[in-house]
UniProtKB/Swiss-Prot annotation:
Belongs to the RAF family. The gene is raf1. GO terms for biological process: carbon fixation; photosynthesis; ribulose bisphosphate carboxylase complex assembly. GO terms for cellular component: cytoplasm. Transmembrane segments: none annotated. Residues 218-344 are annotated as: C-terminal beta-sheet. This is RuBisCO accumulation factor 1. InterPro entries: RAF1, Raf1_C, Raf1_cyn, Raf1_HTH, Raf1_N. It is found in: Cytoplasm. The lineage of its organism: Bacteria, Bacillati, Cyanobacteriota, Cyanophyceae, Synechococcales. Disruption phenotype: No visible phenotype under normal growth conditions, no change in RuBisCO large subunit levels, no change in RuBisCO carboxylase activity. During sulfur starvation deletion cells are protected against protein degradation. Keywords: Carbon dioxide fixation, Chaperone, Cytoplasm, Photosynthesis. A major RuBisCO chaperone. Acts after GroEL-GroES chaperonin to fold and/or assemble the large subunit of RuBisCO (ccbL, rbcL). Cooperates with RbcX in RbcL folding, plays the major role in assembly of dimers into RbcL(8)-Raf1(8) intermediate complexes. RbcS replaces Raf1, leading to holoenzyme formation. Required for optimal reconstitution of RbcL(8) upon expression in E.coli. Has been suggested to be involved in RuBisCO recycling and homeostasis rather than assembly. Homodimer. Forms an RbcL(8)-Raf1(8) complex. Forms complexes of many stoichiometries with RbcL with and without RbcS. RbcX and Raf1 can bind simultaneously to RbcL. Interacts with both RuBisCO subunits (ccbL, ccbS), GroEL, DnaK and alpha and beta phycocyanin (cpcA, cpcB) in pull-down experiments with tagged protein. C-terminally tagged Raf1 does not interact with either RuBisCO subunit, suggesting its C-terminus is involved in binding. It comes from Synechocystis sp. (strain ATCC 27184 / PCC 6803 / Kazusa).
Amino acid sequence: MTHSPESNPTVSAAEAAELIRSLLHKEGTWVDWGKKCQQLQKAGYGAEEIFEQSGFQKVQQNLVIVASQVYESLVKQGIDETVLSYYRGPKSDVLYELRILNHQQRAIAAVEAQQKNLAADEAKELAKAFQEFGYLSQLPEGFTDHPGDALAYQCWKLARQKKNLPERTRLIVKGLKFAHSPNARQAIEKLLTDLTAQPSRKAPLVPVFRLEEDQEAARLIPVAGTFPLQPQAVQAVQSLEQVEPFGLVSYQGEGAVVPVPQWQAILTAEDPVAIFCPAGQVSESLARKDEQVLVVVDRSKKIWNDGSYFLLNQGETVAIQWCETEPEREILAQVVLVLRPKKIFDANNLREPWQMDD
C-alpha cells in the first residue's frame, strides 16, 4: 500500500492491508466487499488506489458500497432471512436500484423483487414507479400503495394512451404481472376487453396559421378613381379604419378598395387613397410611360417639401408633380408609393420548343 497510515487514524496500515487482501481474494459475500470498500474509502484511500491493489473497479466499488447500505437498511427493517439470503446470492445490482426509496419502501420493494425474481432493469423500473406513486396526492382508484400496484398503474396509464396494438398488449401483460390487488388486476383486465372496441376517431389538426410579418397582411386602400380625375373625387373618398389584430375593415362608402402589401410607406400613411394612372403622368423618368400604375397618396400630408411628389389641384383635374419650390396650386396629398403591376408570365411558353437564331 502506498497510502500513508498517518492520514488514516481509524484503520491502521496492517488493517488496511488485510482489507485489501480480503478484497483481492473476494472473501465473504458482496455485502462484506461493500463494507470493506467503504471502510477504506472513509479512511482516505482513493477508489483508484483500491482498484490497483484489489482489482475492484471504481464502478464495482460504488455498486457494492451502495447495495450493502441498502442491504443493511433491510436488516434494520427486520426482513425475513429468506429474503436476505436471496440477495446475498448475489443480487447487489438489484438492491442498488432500490437506493432511491426510503427504508420502509425498500423493504416492501425488496420482497416484491424477490418474489418475482426481478433483474436489475426491472427492479429499477419498479423502484421508480413506486417512488413516483408516493408523490401522488391520492391513490388512483382501484390501486393500493404497493410497489406492484404502482408499476401496474404505470402500465395501465400508458396502455390507455397507446393505439399500437402490440405495444398496448405488451403493457397489459406487464401490468397483470405486477398487479398486487384484485382491483388493480381488474382495472387492467378491463383494458383487454377494450382491445376489440373500435377506437374513437381523433379530431383532425386545426389548420392554424400565424401572421409573422406585417407584409403578409395587406392593407385595404380606398380607390378614388382613374386619371383624368377631379379634385372632388379625391376629397370625397371615405377613409378606412382597420381594427387590429386582423385588420378588420367596415366600409360604408361607395366605390372600390384595393389591397396593398403593408410596406413601411403604407404602414405610416394616415389617410391613404389609391389612384390609377399611366406611369408617364407620375414622372417622365419612369420607363414604359403607358403602363398603368397604382399611386397611393396620403391626404394627411399636405406640407410641401422638395423630396416628395404631390397630388395637386389643377382646377378641373388633379396632377402628380414634383416641385422644386413650393407650388401655388393646392396640395391635395403626398405621394407615398407607386406600385407597378406584377409581370404576367405565360406558362404556355414552357411547353413550346426553344427557338434560336441561326
